[in-house]
Amino acid sequence: MTRVSILTPILPAGRDLTRSVQTWAAMWLLLATLVPVAHAQVTLPGTNPFNFQDDPALGMVDSIRAFLERETAASTTRRATLQGSDAGPRRERFRRMIGAVDVRVPVTALQFDGTTAVPAEVARGKDYRVFAVRWPVFDDVDAEGLLLEPNGTPRARIVAIPDADWSPEVLAGLSPGVDPAAQFARRLAESGCQVLVPVLIDRSDTWSGIPGMRMTNQSHREWIFRMAYESGRHIIGYEVQKVLAAVDWFAHENVAHAAPIGVAGYGEGGLLALYAASLDERVGAALVSGYFQSREKLWREPIYRNLWGLLREFDDMQLASLVAPRALIVEASRFPEVAGPPASTPERRGAAPSGQIVTPPLDSIRSEIDRANAANVQLVVSGGGRGLPGSSEALTALLRSLRVSAASFSPRDPPRDMRREFDPSIRLHRQFDQLVAHTQALIRASERKRQAFWSRADASSLDTWKKSTQPLRNYIWEEVIGRLPDPNVPANPRTRMIYDEPKFRGYEVMLDVWPGVFAYGILLVPKSIQPGERRPVVVCQHGLEGYAREVADPKTDSGYYHRFAVRLAEEGFVTFAPQNPYIGQDRFRLIQRQGHPLKLSLFSFILGQHQRLLEWLGGLSFVDRERIGFYGLSYGGKTAMRVPPLLDGYALSICSADFNEWVWKTTSIDSRYSYMLTQEYDMLEFDFANVMNYSDLANLMAGRPFMVERGHEDGVAPDEWVAYEFAKVRRFYTHLGIPERAEIEFFNGPHTIHGVGTFAFLRKQLRWLQ
């Protein structure tokens, strides 16, 4: 996607965009010191003086992040009030959060996985044998791993889950590099347990990308996470389903011979053990090692652990309460420390965000457990909190919780792998490809899901459509975008005149929205407005890494914006150029990382800012509140698709340089246009594909006018995607008898404001034909 910044066209090759933002911010600060001198005391009537001295764009981003930090801290208290509520509905809500929603196929037997060259029997221990196995999860997805089968009757049945970067062979003692004391699958088998060890998707980046087009440095876990998130699924949910499919087989085996079922995991496997035990009461006890801690810093962990809305209701202790009264053994051990994603290289461009896993202080783990005072949770400390996973004390506690007499866990020599030509990467690649193919099939099926969602509305007439879509609008705002309370502090408008041109005056405007969070922008007021006259307004929205001044400064002619707010003001429209908070690269993208666990997104804040803006604009004596339109480019086009459809205060919306088949755009593994290949991880919206696409959002505006502005050379998407998606809008508006209210203009040009057909559309639809 083209980054929108006024400085981009004049930057020398290789110039860092961050420096561009810093340069523009420095220019703003210089202007901020000069403008008050030239226009002292010149404010819009009924407002207070504007005295903000910092860059309002970056100040806005920082204010939102501070708001999220406060909300994250406050969420701990709110979650505590939920403990003890009905576990059944809570489990179902948690199941949806992690995307473990697909129906598993029955598992009545494991399949031995072997050939004449690579036998299924992998190794033999003193009292058990090891087999390579697979078991079905969905019709098109299997789990694979190792079965450690005791020679006698199993004393217990355990799913032993390794960290993502450990193979099953590591836990079984068949691979070098891990201390024998940490090989807890082998040690459980030596104690007479039947143990099933699944393969997890690892953190390398070998297959993350589109071969022959572009490869990325996203881990395999992130690559699957990105596409799955849009379809309401998750890498975590997929792997929990694999664990629970193993439990399904154990339960089937228990019909013939009953034995208690447990789960034990380390690192990413510890997460899966906790989540699986929370969801399935057939699991009699769980051992979680190298994972359990406070989740208030979830946004600093790898993005593939991001869960939409998790901290609204759950943290590790809340999940422990879902395990209760069954036992949860928490082992404080050294976490599988992760410094970040794989390094980018010339062959693998950086697309992955930062995210770390670090071992927390032992005191913080103790305090997290003490906070809940849960009788079912037992803490075991390995090596002062930095020892190996699967200590004898932890394994003993697990077996005792399953009412199995604990073995001595005396040291034994590990078995020897009898396979001569085994390559674990082939198995891992097969598992990776299955989950990618499964997710892409869900994406292809999502159009039917969307049709089912929108079939709840009545499109027999315009009136019935408006009334019947209100619940759907609420669902989109609350469940997909994330809804904040309506602005709840006085607007306290502050203004300062910064332009005095022959045809208009310009004012900086700042409005309070929530405590500590403000809206900012530039208002252009034509001088031709007569006393008592009320004019139409066009809200002119900048794009990614942009500033309001780039749209509304009469002395600036950006290659992207072409002074469109100024040109419209010169025609007689009142214009307002809001500052949106998608600026500062990772500085703003962390809003998404911090917000998603709270069921909030960047657009949760943008919607509130525009609520306040519409309220304020509508109260100005020279504004006709019934004629306020929206016109946005690029990320401003994304705003055009998400804000006016939900806010009735906008009389129309124009999406420039962004409209396309959004589901394909965010999930495609075939197209160079795909966000799967870029660093824009801020585009992720949980379950978006099953609820809406851009045509659905445009149709939600009916019968308000809607228009698309599209340059043939725009690299956001191909014309064919744009035309395909807009055809649905045109057909729907025609069905409602208002085809003249849906338009598209194609022009020869790039990612830019064209300002020809759109200006005519504004004049017509806002009834400004002078």
Feature roles, as predicted:
Residues 158-245, 293-301, 531-619, 665-668:
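Cap/lid segment of the alpha/beta-hydrolase catalytic domain
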Residues 141-143, 150-158, 164-166, 516-519, ...:
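Proline/glycine-enriched tight loop/beta-turn segments at coil->beta junctions
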Residues 41-143, 232-235, 281, 295-518, ...:
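Alpha/beta-hydrolase-fold serine-hydrolase catalytic core, especially in secreted/extracellular enzymes
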Residues 119-139, 150, 182-191, 195-196, ...:
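Catalytic cores of nucleotide-enabled group-transfer and carboxylate-activating enzymes in metabolic
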Residues 4-27:
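Bacterial N-terminal signal peptides that target proteins for export
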Residues 248-319, 615-672, 676:
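Primarily recognizes the serine-hydrolase "nucleophile elbow" in alpha/beta-hydrolase
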Residues 155-156, 191-193, 258-259, 281-285, ...:
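Loop/turn elements at helix/coil->beta-strand transitions in domains of secreted/extracellular proteins
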Residues 24-36:
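Bacterial N-terminal signal peptides
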